[in-house]
UniProtKB/Swiss-Prot annotation:
The reaction(s) this protein catalyses: (8S)-3',8-cyclo-7,8-dihydroguanosine 5'-triphosphate = cyclic pyranopterin phosphate + diphosphate
Source species of the chain: Sulfurisphaera tokodaii (strain DSM 16993 / JCM 10545 / NBRC 100140 / 7) (Sulfolobus tokodaii)
Class in the EC hierarchy, top level: lyase
Protein known as: Probable cyclic pyranopterin monophosphate synthase
Gene, per the UniProt record: moaC
Assigned protein family: Belongs to the MoaC family.
Subunit and partners: Homohexamer; trimer of dimers.
Chain residues that bind substrate: M66, C67, H68, M102, E103
GO biological process: Mo-molybdopterin cofactor biosynthetic process
Presence of keyword Lyase: yes
EC code(s) of this entry: 4.6.1.17
Sorted UniProt keywords: Lyase, Molybdenum cofactor biosynthesis
Function comment: Catalyzes the conversion of (8S)-3',8-cyclo-7,8-dihydroguanosine 5'-triphosphate to cyclic pyranopterin monophosphate (cPMP).
Amino acid sequence: MTEAKIVDISSKDIVLREAVVEGYIKLRKETIEKIKNKEVEKGDVITVAKTAGILAAKKTPELIPMCHPIPLEFVDVEIKIEEEGLRVISTVKAHYKTGVEMEALTATSVALLTIWDMVKKYEKDENGQYPYTEIKSIRVINKIKTYDDMK
């Protein structure tokens, strides 16, 4: 068994790294309407979830022990309101020696968790359970490594 350690990337080249991750949260139609109409008691769900996702991307190496601290150059969290829920798409870019998919995964995951937290009051049934609410399909939809003149 090997010891836990951060992988040595010192000999790798600095290149442009990009990762795009999406995830989905299924919500009740009534909750979606509250989000659209900005009637959620905790505030603007879209703005808060985007902000949480961006912050999460920046905090990834503090949350996931073996992640390298990467100087992120771009983080975008897009949230699309769909018929049965919200889709979160996070894009992260950096010129570095290792990929940024963990940062994009973290951004999407935390944005989805933030949405759940902000609307949980409206999602509970009469027993305080969440029979309809579901976070699903968190996946890397694109990972790009672009070689340019950065070294």
